[in-house]
Amino acid sequence: MAREMTILGSAVLTLLLAGYLAQQYLPLPTPKVIGIDLGTTYCSVGVFFPGTGKVKVIPDENGHISIPSMVSFTDNDVYVGYESVELADSNPQNTIYDAKRFIGKIFTAEELEAEIGRYPFKVLNKNGMVEFSVTSNETITVSPEYVGSRLLLKLKEMAEAYLGMPVANAVISVPAEFDLKQRNSTIEAANLAGLKILRVINEPTAAAMAYGLHKADVFHVLVIDLGGGTLDVSLLNKQGGMFLTRAMSGNNKLGGQDFNQRLLQYLYKQIYQTYGFVPSRKEEIHRLRQAVEMVKLNLTLHQSAQLSVLLTVEEQDRKEPHSSDTELPKDKLSSADDHRVNSGFGRGLSDKKSGESQVLFETEISRKLFDTLNEDLFQKILVPIQQVLKEGHLEKTEIDEVVLVGGSTRIPRIRQVIQEFFGKDPNTSVDPDLAVVTGVAIQAGIDGGSWPLQVSALEIPNKHLQKTNFN
C-alpha cells in the first residue's frame, strides 16, 4: 500500500512538473475571447494574453488603437471608422454617429425632437425607437443595432487579423445606466456581427478592473469618465471581487468637443477682427477644427501650442479688418456649430477663383487661455460628482480611490479641479483612453479561462439605480 501511494505521489508530482514546464516553455495559447469597448465617440478591442497576464489593445491596419464610432453609407459600400471620417464632409447626411445614444432606448416625442436637430442625418421616430434614414442606391432605414454591428464587425476583423484566427466570443462593456432592453440591443448588435457575448460588464467596473481595484483593499471608488461628448460619474462599492454601483450622475452634453468649441469660437472672432471675414467653406471649417483638436492635445503636455491654417477669403463677404463690428454675423456663426461630433477632421483645399484670395492664419494658444475659455465648463464637472456623493450619503473624504477614464481627463486643469475638490490626487496610473477596454479584456481573459488566474469582477444588480443628468 505504501509503495502504491509513493508511486501515486510521484505521478502527481510528475504531472505538476510537466504542467509547470509546459507553461514555461511551450508556446502560449492564443486568446479566444476578446474584450470590446463600444464607445459613443470611439471604440476599441483588446485581449488578455495567457501566461504573461498582459493586455493588448489591438490596432487597426494603420496602427490606430481605437476607431471613430462612425459609419458611412454610399452607393458602393459601407465604410466604418476612419474611412467613414473621410466621407463625413462630403456625405454628412449618410454618415451616422452617436448610435450608442439611441440603441435600445425608448424616447418620448419631445425628447426625440430635441435630438433630431443635433444631427445632419435623418433621425426617424418608430414608436419611440430610433431609426436612421440613409440614401445609397435607394433610400433605406437602418437601426442603431445595425450601425453598432458594423462597428463591432470591424473590431472583430481587427482582432482576427492580429490573432491570426477566427474570433467568435466576446465580453462587451456598456454604461452602468443601460437598462435590460439597451443591454439586449447591444448583444443583438454583436450577434449581427457574428459575435457571441459571454458577458456584459458595466464601464465603471471595467475601468476599476483596469486600475487593479478588483484586487485592491478599497471600498468606496469614484469613477469619473469624461470623453468626447459625455460625462459619467459612478460611485462603486467594492468588497472582495464584488462591485455594486451605488449612484450615477453625469452630463450627456459635456465633453472634449465642447472644449474645442470654445476655442473655435475664440478663433472665429480673431479671424473676423483680423481679416474681416469668417470661414464658410466646409473643408476650411473642418481644417480649423482639426487644428483646434491638435492644439488641445498639445496643451496637455505643453504650456503653449501653435496653430496655422490656410484660409480662403471671398472678397464680397469681407469687411474692414479691426472694425468696431466685432460681433460675428449670426449666419456665419452657425457654421462653427454645425456637425459638432465631426470636429477634428478636414479635407483638401479648393482651387482659387476670381475674387478670392488666401491668407495664412497663425496664432499661439496658451494653456492659460484655453483654461480660461473653458473654466466654467470645467467647474461643471463637479456638479455630478457632488450629486453622487449626496445620493451615496458620503463625504468626499470618505472616497478611497478616484479614477479617471476618457481622453478629456488628460487636460491638466481638469485634473487640478478634481484634485482640489477631493484634496488628493486622482489615480492616473492607467491610460484613460484605454481604461475601459483594458478592464473588459481582463474580464474576457477570465471568462476564457486564461492563466495566470485573475480575480473576476462580480457585479451586484441595483434595481433602484437611476442616473441623474445635468445637461
Swiss-Prot record:
Residues 315-352 are annotated as: Disordered. It comes from the Eukaryota. Pfam families: HSP70. Residues 1-22 form the signal peptide. CDD domains: ASKHA_NBD_HSP70_HSPA13. One of its GO terms (molecular function) is ATP hydrolysis activity. It is found in: Microsome; Endoplasmic reticulum. GO terms for biological process: chaperone cofactor-dependent protein refolding; protein refolding. Its main location: other. The keyword Plastid does not apply. Keywords: ATP-binding, Endoplasmic reticulum, Microsome, Nucleotide-binding, Signal. The keyword Nucleotide-binding applies. PROSITE patterns: HSP70_1, HSP70_2, HSP70_3. Residues 315-341 have a biased composition (Basic and acidic residues). Binds UBQLN2. This is Heat shock 70 kDa protein 13.
